[in-house]
Amino acid sequence: EYLPTVHGFDEFHGNLYHLNAEEEPEQPDYPKDLPVFQNFFKPRGVLDCKATDVDDPTEDPRFGRVGKQTIRDTGPLTRKRMETIEDDLLARSMDFIDRAHAADKPFLLWHNTTRMHVWTRLSERWHDKTKFGLYADGMQELDWVVGELLAKLDKLGIADNTIVIFTTDNGAEKFSWPDGGTSPFRGEKGLGWEGGFRAPFLMRWPGKIQPGQVLNGIFSLEDVVPTVMAAVGVPDIKEKLLKGYQAGTKHFRVHLDGYNQLPYLTGGSGESLRHEFFYYGEHDLFAIRYQNWKIHFQVKDDWFAGALMRPTVPRPVNLRVDPFEQHMEAPGYPLYAGEKLWTIMPAAYILKLHAETFTNFPPRQAPPDFNPSEMLKHAMSAAASV
């Protein structure tokens, strides 16, 4: 029920998990001979799915009802297969573009590479390509994949009429170095520091977005849907979704926290419409940014083993003055923070407005919480309501 092909996508080909989960069955102490474990916990293989008009009532004991789609498991994503999976994914995307172009149909292609997620398994073609180590070699392969996709648009003569976005979903993962990234910002993926959230975002639309410009306004992945919808002629999708919107056979009534940033990107306005950003990590709100001010409500410095610290008074940082968030460790910081207490109240008000949106649009799914006491609390609450 969660596969893309029952949520608006015509086709889906890919894996469902982070790569380190995919290769877990190859560990020597993995319980290969325990049927219950295999049936309920083993990662699913690389899936090839297509949306259909025929409703398949088949019920899988683990994954649920098939519904209006076909699902073909092409086999596990083993360590060996990881070496060439990028070639497979690229070929699929190239074929999709070719078919859409031949049919003279506009298309949306969401190409997710497995680079650069741990663990990096490279073929001989990319091994030691850069002389800078495993991670740099993987980035070289990623660069090649992007280049091939852009070249395909050029070859078909549709590059000038195609919007291209390159981005990722979090900051660098540093703890797994040398099979991990780096950045000048404090922290990493999973933490509330800038290093956990700042990510590259490149957008190309020839004739509309001026090439070579660097924009420093706040921009979030939440802005992509309203912005791209505006580009294709629906500038008010956010407002329509609030009231209820029919797209094909599906009805949506949702709250998007994004902004239509097309005027900002195309030069129609001088600044980003986004003035705030919420730093969520798992089930915690670490911080809020508004304008240049970032207010830390809780902090930690180790993603997996670090203790979460909730300071009595939230900690303000001016990201224009201290973009790398280093000054909080300075002896003079408490005095500075005391002088800047006025920055906290606007953040509290922004948080209040944010929380009010959950009244009519509550979160659809709670994030995972591996604290056993919380699990027991939820279980007991559910039992009491029966």
Regions found by a protein language model. Give the residues of each.
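Formylglycine-dependent
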Residues: 1-105, 113-115, 119-122, 311
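C-terminal cap/loop subdomain of S1 sulfatases and analogous C-terminal strand-loop tails that border
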Residues: 2-4, 10-11, 16-23, 30-34, ...
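Loop/turn elements at helix/coil->beta-strand transitions in domains of secreted/extracellular proteins
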Residues: 7-10, 102-109, 158-164, 198-199, ...
